[in-house]
Amino acid sequence: MSSETASLLNGKALAQKIQGELKTTVEKLQGNIGRPPGLAVIMVGDNPASAVYVRNKEKACAKVGIASFGRHLPTETPQEEVEALIHQLNADERVDGILVQLPLPPHLDTVKLLHAIAPEKDADGLHPMNLGHLIRGEEGLRSCTPWGVMRLLEEYNLDVAGKHAVVVGRSILVGKPLALMLLEKNATVSIAHSRTPDLGEITRQGDIIIAAVGKPNLITGEMVKPEAIAIDVGINRIMTKDGASKLVGDFEFNSVSQVSSYITPVPGGVGPMTVAMLLQNTVLSYQKH
């Protein structure tokens, strides 16, 4: 094991750089288009974590010059009413991007609501048409978190071509689209998940390991190949011994940072990149006007 610790992949700094670039783009385009870009975020219920995420997205929009059209609905709002709102926003010319904040209350059909968003306004990149474009290697709006991971690797000149990338997690939000993006850039990709026996045997093969499970400290230093790149998508709130709460990722940071060459911190790694890519998707839709 090296006595050196891993270099940090600073998602917060890169997100700020991207926001600055987007602000310049918006300022240039606004005169021609005659209005700012618009992002509508739909939140149903009062999930405290979701409320924080929505506020962060609105603040980021303001920095870039994107108009926010927040829609906060009561927990008991019926499916038909949420669908009707989405159709209304699809038709609203001021709105370039639509995002449904997840998770939704259990009585709502998440998949059906995501399908209701017009593909060209799908700011989260989760519509089946956009995921289909990704599978085919075609242009389309990309899923924000995986795209943020790829952009972070690119910023630090970490070429994935020919590397063995191990993705831990198979969700439609992160694991599956990220595996496809890595394939698109010529990585050899393995996907591990909750039913994978001996996870460490798989992760130790990875030149790049991306953890997106949501289990605190799941992957320890002994499960990581020396000099591997560790990308932590997990955001988990745990209680410390003194009773305070703390955010940690899916990697056990202290041990993994002693083995890996690069690692993303939690917070300040992938999280800010997700928001930056959401803004990027909104501006891309805006540019098509």
UniProtKB/Swiss-Prot annotation:
InterPro entries: Aminoacid_DH-like_N_sf (IPR046346), NAD(P)-bd_dom_sf (IPR036291), THF_DH/CycHdrlase (IPR000672), THF_DH/CycHdrlase_cat_dom (IPR020630), THF_DH/CycHdrlase_CS (IPR020867), THF_DH/CycHdrlase_NAD-bd_dom (IPR020631)
Catalytic function, reaction form: (6R)-5,10-methylene-5,6,7,8-tetrahydrofolate + NADP(+) = (6R)-5,10-methenyltetrahydrofolate + NADPH; (6R)-5,10-methenyltetrahydrofolate + H2O = (6R)-10-formyltetrahydrofolate + H(+)
HAMAP family with a match to the protein in the record: THF_DHG_CYH
CDD domains found in the cross-reference section: NAD_bind_m-THF_DH_Cyclohyd
UniProt lineage: Bacteria, Bacillati, Cyanobacteriota, Cyanophyceae, Oscillatoriophycideae
Protein name: Bifunctional protein FolD
CC annotations in GO: cytosol
Subunit structure: Homodimer.
Keyword NADP: yes
Pathway info: One-carbon metabolism; tetrahydrofolate interconversion
GO annotation (BP), single: tetrahydrofolate interconversion
Gene name for this UniProt entry: folD
Protein task: Catalyzes the oxidation of 5,10-methylenetetrahydrofolate to 5,10-methenyltetrahydrofolate and then the hydrolysis of 5,10-methenyltetrahydrofolate to 10-formyltetrahydrofolate.
Family listed: Belongs to the tetrahydrofolate dehydrogenase/cyclohydrolase family.
Parts forming coiled coils: none
GO molecular function, one term: methenyltetrahydrofolate cyclohydrolase activity
Gene3D superfamilies with a match to the protein in the record: Leucine Dehydrogenase, chain A, domain 1, NAD(P)-binding Rossmann-like Domain
UniProt-listed SUPFAM superfamilies: Aminoacid dehydrogenase-like, N-terminal domain, NAD(P)-binding Rossmann-fold domains
